[in-house]
Curated annotation (Swiss-Prot):
GO BP annotations, alphabetical order: glycine biosynthetic process from serine; tetrahydrofolate interconversion
Function, as annotated: Catalyzes the reversible interconversion of serine and glycine with tetrahydrofolate (THF) serving as the one-carbon carrier. This reaction serves as the major source of one-carbon groups required for the biosynthesis of purines, thymidylate, methionine, and other important biomolecules. Also exhibits THF-independent aldolase activity toward beta-hydroxyamino acids, producing glycine and aldehydes, via a retro-aldol mechanism.
Family (UniProt): Belongs to the SHMT family.
Modified residues (N6-(pyridoxal phosphate)lysine): K234
Keywords: Amino-acid biosynthesis, Cytoplasm, One-carbon metabolism, Pyridoxal phosphate, Transferase
Domain of life from the UniProt record: Bacteria
Subcellular location per the Swiss-Prot or TrEMBL entry: Cytoplasm
Chemical reaction(s) catalysed: (6R)-5,10-methylene-5,6,7,8-tetrahydrofolate + glycine + H2O = (6S)-5,6,7,8-tetrahydrofolate + L-serine
Listed name of the protein: Serine hydroxymethyltransferase 1
Length: 424
């Protein structure tokens, strides 16, 4: 036997016990806690298998049929499958599936369609936008003249009149529609009309709602935008990564050059394999049922929380996420996030529009139903989760240091619920 054989045969448990231990503990956490982080989901066994495949060994700089390395025949097959499937899902003419993340996808569009110093108009982080849409700490806020639009103080809805006024005042080269914490549908046609009125390109970042769009439960931005970006996880249930879509051949060429060699070197072929598998799953008939359940569960969770005395930003949701205003309960986001985690429920603290608290504290939390729906939760289960969340809220309100007895009791109920809907 070759002395290299153990390298190829020794399992992780023998090779690196500390890493194996951490992975097993994370598996146990995912199995035993309710995941309500709106940007997270649970992938299939098939996606895990593809992402853990030998494709991790392969360098494949370039694009299918035009690689800078030899031995890319089967890498080409996998990437072509991913491209064809995502084009079919969103009825797009061109797709790039190589971005390592949504941020890389957004960065590639800016590199392709704008120059440093150009004006970019995007949704402010405070109003529910994303860091990559022009926030000051991000590259997009440093390289570009980033102008930000927000929401109406009374309705908390996007103020399209403000978007239009800012566009005419600042004449942006690029307008970005998309969000990380906005619970309502977007009017892509209105965004495109505004962009056309000032000669700007329209980019839609559909990362959060890509699955909702794929299922036909939200307007398709590919029909309106010059270019569309997304992540592959969240509501699409794929591996962590990104992609870019367009129907414009010239823009597609610029995007390809911006992704490679502009921002990235070799693509992560094992992740692209996972993307291809996930896209194939989206094309199955039961994916629409899944998304319908995600939306119904979000409505059910929201109804319970509202009945329990908390406010929902905009009054409800059109998608998979809820932005919960904790001020009626006299609570803040950071301690609520911590208390819920102690009780077996994971979410994230989140600012609400016009929040006066620091981003590390916040007046709200963001909740989402995709992961719980993936493991099989229905309306009844999400109503139960909502009831348990309210119990933690009320206990924390009575005891700001945390109510250990209530949190542990809720944790036991959450554990029992999760045992009924196992993963992996």
């Amino acid at each position: 036997m070759s002395n290299t054989q153990p390298f190829f045969s020794q399992p992780l448990a023998e090779r690196d016990a500390p890493v194996r231990s951490a992975i097993l503990k994370e598996l146990e956490r995912q199995q035993s806690q309710v995941e309500l982080i709106a940007s997270e989901n649970i992938v299939s066994r098939a996606v895990l298998e593809a992402q853990g495949s030998v494709l991790t060994n392969k360098y494949a700089e370039g694009y299918p049929g035009k690689r800078y390395y030899g031995g890319c025949e089967f890498a080409d097959e996998v990437e072509a499958l991913a491209i064809d499937r995502v084009k079919q899902i969103f009825n797009a003419g061109y797709a790039n599936v190589q971005p390592h993340s949504g941020a890389q996808a957004n960065g590639s569009v800016m590199l392709a369609l704008a120059k440093p110093g150009d004006t970019v108009l995007g949704m402010s982080l405070d109003a529910g936008g994303h860091l990559t849409h022009g926030a000051k700490p991000a590259l997009s806020g440093k390289w570009f003249n980033a102008v930000q639009y927000g929401v109406n103080r009374d309705t908390m809805l996007i103020d399209y009149d403000q978007v239009e006024a800012l566009a005419h005042e600042h004449k942006p080269n690029l307008i970005i529609a998309g969000f990380s914490a906005y619970p309502r549908a977007l009017d892509f046609a209105r965004f495109r009309a505004i962009a056309d009125s000032v000669g700007a390109k329209l980019m839609v970042d559909m990362a959060h709602i890509a699955g909702v769009i794929a299922a036909g439960r939200h307007a398709n931005p590919v029909e309106h935008a010059h270019v569309v970006t997304s992540t592959t996880h969240k509501t699409l249930r794929g591996p962590r990564g990104g992609f870019v879509l367009t129907n414009d051949e010239d823009i597609a060429k610029k995007i390809n050059s911006a992704v490679f060699p502009g921002l990235q070197g070799g693509p992560l072929m094992h992740v692209i394999a996972g993307k291809a598998v996930a896209f194939g799953e989206v094309l199955q008939a039961d994916f629409k049922t899944y998304i319908d359940n995600v939306l119904a569960n979000a409505q059910a969770l929201g109804e319970v929380l509202k009945a329990g005395g908390v406010d929902l930003v905009t009054g409800g949701t059109d998608n998979h996420l809820l932005l919960v205003d904790l001020r009626p309960k006299g609570l803040k986001g950071a301690p609520v996030e911590q208390a819920l985690e102690r009780a077996g429920i994971t979410c994230n603290k989140n600012g609400i529009p016009f929040d006066t608290e620091k981003p590390t504290v916040t007046s709200g939390i963001r909740l989402g139903t995709p992961a719980g729906t993936t493991r099989g939760f229905g309306v009844a289960e999400f109503r139960e989760v909502g009831r348990l969340i309210l119990e933690v809220f009320d206990a924390l309100r009575a005891n700001p240091e945390g109510d250990h007895a209530t949190e542990q009791r809720v944790r036991r109920e959450i554990f029992a619920l999760c045992e009924r809907f196992p993963i992996y």
